[in-house]
Amino acid sequence: MKKKFAVIGSILALAPFALATNGDNMIGIGPASRGMGGIGTGMPVGPIDSIFRNPAWMSYFNTKRFFLSFGGILFMPNVKVSSKMFMDFEPRNSGGGGYFQTNGRVKSDADTFIVPEVGIVHKVN
C-alpha cells in the first residue's frame, strides 16, 4: 500500500514538469498524412506514420525492401505569459505596513524550430 502511495505521489509531484509549449497537435506525422487530415492512423502512408501513429501498419511493409523516409516540420509556437502578484503585508508580521505589486509579461524569443522526422522500416527475419 505504501508503494502505491509513493508511486501516485511521485506521478503527481512530477506531472507539472512535463508541460512544454502545449506542443504541436500533430494531425499526421509526414506530409502525405498531414495533407490528408491525419489518415496515417487508419491506413499506411509511409514509414514515419507507421512508426509514430499506428505501429501495426509496419507489417504492411512485409517485403525484403528497405523503407526510408525523412522530412521535417517547421514549428513556430507563439508563447506569451502574463502574471500579476499582489501582497499585502500585515503590520504585526512585517514590522511596518506595506503593499507590494508586480506585473510581468514575457514573450519567448525562441519562436522557430525545425523538428526532423526519420522513419526506417525493414523486415528483420
UniProtKB/Swiss-Prot annotation:
Signal peptide: 1-20
Keywords from the named record: Signal
Source organism, top-level taxon: Bacteria
Entry protein name: Uncharacterized protein aq_628
Species in which this protein is naturally found: Aquifex aeolicus (strain VF5)
